[in-house]
């Protein structure tokens, strides 16, 4: 009983103050004359075993971003953190990200989720670039970039995404016009998830699923549920030593493996259909990213399959939640919404003629997406296992140290962003060319930036463009939404949104 009493007292402490956290005002530490040793870096308070106990009892770290945010307020812009035997250094200033990139070599190393590796090793699956480090990562990444991340690839798949975004807008309009009021109030989350699956599946595999025209098929619903379970169980397992979690979290491991089985099965079926069609006759036209890789990339089929599964799993939630949060922010900031609508209407004819022009014709909408990801980064951490010694905030960081950048705190720091609590897309246009590019880090940096970055940007940009042309988006909710950490950051609940047709 004594141990539980101590544990509960420790666990209660951080959470009592989280909702009262002040606006972060952390600036760089003024450097003394000599570089300080690693051991002098401020240490995250509390005992290591208590954090493992907390993780086990609460089945995750849903308030992880808030606790880390508060720790920066108390300790400054750098501190050490240890949980489950994993030592790391956390930072939150753009200058420290720049220093980390400057010491990157040919093979930037990142931390990879242990549960994801465990699943692939035990099932005998090859790893994609998200889970690789070293020369193998570089070889595969260089083969993938032309077909996925290049401007040429984006120009090819943008018209495909535009077709899905138009269909989404038309389907929503049909539902709205069924009401005599010409408006519809609903939970838009299921529709947005169906859109991201439909668009991503078309871009990756060249195949429409028909999710926008009718109720989704059971396989798609199972896939969405599997993604939710996979992300949530990842956090429940990744910070605990496997030697411990195999005994204390057997049910969670079972859920995690079953979720990945569903994800792999879903992607494998799409890959098998595409592979058969390609072997029967090479298509003369562009038919998606995976077809391009199978016909042009110098990669094995297993490597293409592994990376296709990573792209499939990573292209749904990570696009859907920024879309949902953007719609919410525009609904409670009608003046911003109107400015974006005017931009979209002015560019509508040019984008209709050539959807690729959306990238250059909608600068304020692109800024709005940056602003959403500043406040609500899907991945709250960027990390590097530094391969050479460096100095951060005048502390020596030895080679091999895991350094994590907390994007949640970086985006809410008034030393970097004036009035950070305000949703103000114009700030990104006002600051063009006036400073570092590192404040916008939602998709990572350097060679290890998100492989699906351009696909995600196009999916979000075109959907919002077509929605804003056709609907006013409204809400009664003005309060901030509570965000929770489940490997990605998601809203705990979403308010109803009203879509009102524009004649």
Curated annotation (Swiss-Prot):
Gene3D superfamilies membership: Cytochrome P450
Keywords of the record: Heme, Iron, Membrane, Metal-binding, Mitochondrion, Mitochondrion inner membrane, Monooxygenase, Oxidoreductase, Steroidogenesis, Transit peptide
Membrane topology category: Peripheral membrane protein
Organism superkingdom: Eukaryota
Residues the entry annotates as binding heme: 450
Any one GO BP annotation for this protein: aldosterone biosynthetic process
Transit peptide: 1-24
Pathway where this protein functions: Steroid biosynthesis; glucocorticoid biosynthesis; Steroid hormone biosynthesis
Catalytic activities: a steroid + 2 reduced [adrenodoxin] + O2 + 2 H(+) = an 11beta-hydroxysteroid + 2 oxidized [adrenodoxin] + H2O; 11-deoxycortisol + 2 reduced [adrenodoxin] + O2 + 2 H(+) = cortisol + 2 oxidized [adrenodoxin] + H2O; 21-hydroxyprogesterone + 2 reduced [adrenodoxin] + O2 + 2 H(+) = corticosterone + 2 oxidized [adrenodoxin] + H2O; corticosterone + 2 reduced [adrenodoxin] + O2 + 2 H(+) = 18-hydroxycorticosterone + 2 oxidized [adrenodoxin] + H2O
Molecular function as annotated in GO: corticosterone 18-monooxygenase activity; heme binding; iron ion binding; steroid 11-beta-monooxygenase activity
Any Gene Ontology CC annotation: mitochondrial inner membrane
Family indicated by similarity: Belongs to the cytochrome P450 family.
Task performed by this protein: A cytochrome P450 monooxygenase that catalyzes the biosynthesis of aldosterone and other adrenal corticoids. Differing from other species (such as human, rat and mice), it is able to catalyze three sequential oxidative reactions of 11-deoxycorticosterone (21-hydroxyprogesterone), namely 11-beta hydroxylation, followed by two successive oxidations at C18 yielding 18-hydroxy and then 18-oxo intermediates, and ending with the formation of aldosterone. Steroid 11beta, 18- and 19-hydroxylase.
Name of this protein: Cytochrome P450 11B1, mitochondrial
Species this chain originates from: Sus scrofa (Pig)
């Amino acid at each position: 009983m004594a141990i539980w009493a101590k544990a509960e007292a420790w666990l209660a402490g951080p959470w009592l103050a989280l909702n009262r956290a002040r606006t972060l005002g952390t600036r760089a530490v003024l450097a003394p004359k000599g570089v300080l040793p690693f051991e002098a870096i401020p240490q995250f308070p509390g005992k290591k075993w208590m954090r493992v106990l907390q993780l086990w009892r609460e089945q995750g770290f849903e308030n992880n971003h808030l606790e880390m945010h508060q720790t920066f307020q108390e300790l400054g812009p750098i501190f050490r953190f240890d949980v489950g035997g994993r030592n790391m250094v956390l930072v939150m200033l753009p200058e420290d990200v720049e220093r980390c990139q400057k010491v990157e070599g040919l093979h930037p190393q990142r931390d990879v989720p242990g549960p994801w590796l465990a699943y692939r090793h035990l099932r005998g699956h090859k790893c994609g670039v998200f889970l690789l480090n070293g020369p193998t990562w570089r070889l595969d990444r260089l083969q993938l970039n032309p077909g996925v991340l290049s401007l040429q690839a984006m120009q090819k798949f943008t018209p495909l995404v535009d077709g899905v975004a138009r269909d989404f807008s038309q389907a929503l309009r049909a539902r709205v016009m069924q009401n005599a009021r010409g408006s519809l109030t609903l939970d838009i989350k299921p529709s947005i998830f169906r859109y991201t699956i439909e668009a991503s599946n078309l871009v990756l595999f060249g195949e429409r699923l028909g999710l926008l025209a009718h109720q989704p098929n059971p396989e798609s619903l199972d896939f969405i549920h599997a993604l939710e379970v996979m992300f949530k169980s990842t956090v429940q397992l990744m910070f605990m030593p496997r030697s411990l979690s195999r005994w204390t979290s057997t049910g969670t491991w079972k859920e995690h493996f079953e979720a990945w089985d569903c994800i792999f099965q879903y992607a494998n079926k799409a890959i098998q259909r595409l592979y058969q069609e390609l072997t029967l006759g090479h298509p003369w036209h562009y038919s998606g990213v995976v077809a391009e890789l199978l016909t042009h990339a110098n990669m094995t089929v297993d490597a293409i399959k592994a990376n296709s599964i990573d792209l499939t799993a990573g292209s749904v939630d990570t696009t859907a939640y920024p879309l949902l949060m953007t719609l919410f922010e525009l609904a409670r900031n009608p003046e911003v919404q109107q400015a974006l609508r005017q931009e979209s209407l002015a560019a509508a004819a040019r984008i209709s003629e050539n959807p690729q022009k959306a990238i250059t014709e909608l600068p304020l909408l692109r800024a709005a997406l940056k602003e959403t990801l500043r406040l609500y980064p899907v991945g709250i951490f960027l990390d590097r296992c530094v391969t050479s010694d460096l100095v951060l905030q005048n502390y020596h960081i030895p080679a091999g140290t895991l350094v994590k950048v907390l994007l949640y705190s970086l985006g809410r720091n008034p030393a970097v962003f004036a009035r950070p609590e305000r949703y103000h897309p114009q700030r990104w246009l006002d600051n063009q060319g006036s400073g570092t590019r590192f404040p916008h880090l939602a998709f990572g940096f350097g060679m290890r930036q998100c492989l699906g970055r351009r696909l995600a940007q196009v999916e979000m940009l075109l959907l919002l463009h077509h929605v804003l042309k056709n609907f006013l988006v409204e809400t009664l909710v003005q309060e901030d939404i509570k965000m929770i950490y489940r490997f990605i950051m998601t809203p705990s609940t979403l308010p109803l949104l009203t879509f009102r047709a524009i004649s």
